[in-house]
Amino acid sequence: MEKAKKKIAVYLFDIRNRNVGLGEFEWQLGSELARRAEELTMRHGIKFTFIVPRRFIGCFGNNVGYIAISSLSRCVIRYIPRYFDICHITHQMTKLKFMKHARVNLMTVHDINFMYEKSGRKLEQRKRKFAKALKRADELTYISQFVKTDVESHFDTSPKDGSVIYNGVTDLSAVHGDISRFGIADGYLFHISSLLPKKNVHKIVEMMRYLPDERLVVVGDLSTDYISGIKAKIAEWGLSNVTMLEHVSNEEKAELYRHCKAFLFPSLCEGFGLPPLEAMYLGKPVFLSTLTSLPEVGGANAYFFDNLNEENMALTVREGLADFYSHPTEAAEAVRRHAATFTWSHCADSYIQLYLKLLSR
């Protein structure tokens, strides 16, 4: 006799943009859950329904169900008369904060960067919205211990204890591409991100004044006023050792990691921080700020900027490169081992264990 169905809805609307962290998180989680869906139905009677953009109906196969939504319908879907045992809201910024007919609404919190990026009335508005979302959630998960501590220090999360489930990282070691169109020689320092101001990219650009024998390659969105300001500084200082690139493919990204000398990530606000771990998967040294979640994610095998003075940062890079490349084989293997502890398979397994725990209540 078939087990009674236990219905779990998972919000995956942001798979429409895999070039940002939320899109990649939702795509990888959805893929891993779909891969296990048939077994979970047989063993536990679980039936997944994925909430996705219409054009992604069917993209995770036939062992899961789908609800198609649009940007406009995200606010009203919470009221559809469909029962779910669990509705997993996969990040705190979505307009879908809960499902009215779900027995348990589970929300994953990725960061509260607005606490550091907003001020005045805008900050107070964001705080009220987030506090309301926390209150509506029956259970919480966080993508790092830092995020959990940060949220609990600013907001009332009682009586929910919450748990930490780390994101996975995609191993790009088997991904290959062609970067010849960029005309870049091997052995550069590398940074890739959204290039928002919080990524602190201007610091590593300014640092290059003190590393005239090194080259820096920066990849991301070059269309912002922030980047225009950085380009103006590059011209003012006459820096010829900084290259900025836009619109790289996943294959090109992997190749840019592969051919770099080191990865630099002096970010001010990170809930997790995928790019440093992507670089570590390819055996590269990473240089990180000591802020937010980066010490937690980078671990003992990362190098850290003790302060963000450009001259001191340059010294940290010089000393770190000398240390890493004094024993490159052993050092590369150590960072690979660390990165390999963050897998999407383990991430999905942790969420499944939580789903089973919530279903048993």
Q: What are these model-predicted stretches?
A:
Residues M1-R361:
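Carbohydrate transferase catalytic cores enriched for Leloir-type hexosyltransferases
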